[in-house]
UniProtKB/Swiss-Prot annotation:
Pathway: Cell wall biogenesis; peptidoglycan biosynthesis. GO terms for molecular function: ATP binding; UDP-N-acetylmuramoylalanine-D-glutamate ligase activity. Signal peptide: none annotated. One of its GO terms (cellular component) is cytoplasm. This is UDP-N-acetylmuramoylalanine--D-glutamate ligase.
Length: 438
């Protein structure tokens, strides 16, 4: 456990995570200063009066006088103010680093471009099924510092690449990178390898590394070593087995669960289940209770969630598909009897959309593209694409065309922030319109 007594601590970024950092230091007798680039950040009204605050920008004078800066994942380390502080030798960490210095129980750590929330939640459910007192959070749900508890027997953390950049004390009992596809390229000007390098930090000091046999970018930089366990579609220690029209989860040659016993569906969810099982095994959770959790877990909202089935039409909310790889995962192996009406659009975060093209070739595909990067997405296959300003306009247009056997799929391949508060609001709006129009 670290000692922060007498340290001049500055926290950048408020919200729930920022407040958890403030509470963390106050509980240790240290009163931090807080700054946020927003004029009225969420949580400002909850700051104790004793805590000095600066809003509407960064305060370089405070930063350069600090002994320790706790930076929100929302601010790039390349920001000139943070670069100057780093050059001056000032320590810069994030909330996950503070957590790792304090946590007394083993940590299962999960990152990846797609699927990480599902896998994190699943491993948490596996632990609960085994009767283990587990804390689940990080990049989803509760901030990590709010999970700290002497009674906790296991922590399961979802970690973003931004969080990993400021973390050096993580020693996970099991860690995984589920996949690496282009995302947040606006924060990684040197491209995919720079983004991957941030993700790879999760393996440092990990006891077991769970890698994706189908994605070489998830391997440690020097290749697989004795710490590595793999999962994949057709290969890996944990893989899918297809026999007589049925699909099984298989571990090291042994069939352990028929996927028809699972509530989750789709190949991407079956591989998520394999990854979760590998992590649970590595953390020492009993296999039987982990498999039981797989049969009861229904999935998370906004992740290939069927929100309406009416008149033979399925309306599917995959609003969490905020990048190309996530939409690829939704389209890969997708079977639709009639026409697929695919809603794409939003803020593409400087991504390359071309990998989607191979999934859009069928005669039964229609594209409805909206938002900031709608034109770029419509250009993937202009002859079957319609472009509108908003998602609502697109949905009202397609609603006049759907037939029994069709699927309406919101899997936008983009962030939502150009037109929505977050992906949840976008997904809720889709669900509301589906119920109105379907």
């Amino acid at each position: 456990m670290a000692d922060y007594q007498g340290k001049n601590v500055v926290i950048i970024g408020l919200g729930l995570t920022g407040l958890s950092c403030v509470d963390f230091f106050l509980a240790r007798g240290v009163t931090p200063r807080v700054m946020d680039t927003r004029m009225t950040p969420p949580g400002l009204d909850k700051l104790p009066e004793a805590v000095e605050r600066h809003t509407g920008g960064l305060n370089d004078e405070w930063l350069m006088a600090a002994d320790l800066i706790v930076a929100s994942p929302g601010i790039a380390l390349a920001h000139p103010s943070l670069s100057a502080a780093a050059d001056a030798g000032i320590e810069i960490v994030g909330d996950i680093e503070l957590f790792c210095r304090e946590a007394q129980a083993p940590i299962v750590a999960i990152t990846g471009s797609n699927g990480k929330s599902t896998v994190t939640t699943l491993v948490g459910e596996m632990a609960k099924a085994a009767g283990v007192n587990v804390g689940v959070g990080g990049n989803i749900g509760l901030p990590a510092l709010m999970l700290l508890d002497d009674e906790c027997e296991l922590y399961v953390l979802e970690l973003s690449s931004f969080q990993l950049e400021t973390t050096s004390s993580l020693q996970a009992v099991a860690a995984t990178i589920l996949n690496v596809t282009e995302d947040h390229m606006d924060r990684y000007p040197f491209g995919l390898q720079q983004y991957r390098a941030a993700k790879l930090r999760i393996y440092e000091n990990a006891k077991v590394c769970v890698v994706n046999a189908d994605d070489a970018l998830t391997m440690p930089i020097r290749g697989a070593d004795e710490r590595c366990v793999s999962f994949g579609v057709n290969m890996g220690d944990y893989h899918l087995n297809h026999q007589q029209g049925e699909t099984w989860l298989r571990v090291k040659g042994e069939k352990v669960l028929n996927v028809k016993e699972m509530k989750l569906s789709g190949q991407h969810n079956y591989t998520n289940a394999l990854a979760a099982l590998a992590l649970a095994d590595a953390a020492g959770l009993p296999r039987a209770s982990s498999l039981k959790a797989l049969t009861t877990f229904t999935g998370l909202p906004h992740r290939f969630e069927v929100v309406l089935e009416h008149n033979g039409v399925r309306w599917v909310n995959d609003s969490k598909a905020t990048n190309v790889g996530s939409t690829e995962a939704a389209l890969n192996g997708l079977h639709v009897d009639g026409t697929l009406h695919l809603l794409l659009g939003g803020d593409g975060k400087s991504a390359d959309f071309s990998p989607l093209a191979r999934y859009l070739n069928g005669d039964n595909v229609r594209l409805y593209c909206f938002g900031r990067d709608g034109a770029q997405l419509a250009a993937l296959r202009p002859e079957v694409a319609e472009q509108t300003e908003t998602m609502e306009q697109a949905m009202r247009l397609l609603a006049t065309r759907v037939q029994p056997g069709d699927m309406v799929l919101l899997s936008p391949a983009c962030a939502s922030l150009d037109q929505f508060k977050n992906f949840e609001q976008r997904g809720n709006e889709f669900a509301r319109l589906a119920k109105e129009l379907g």
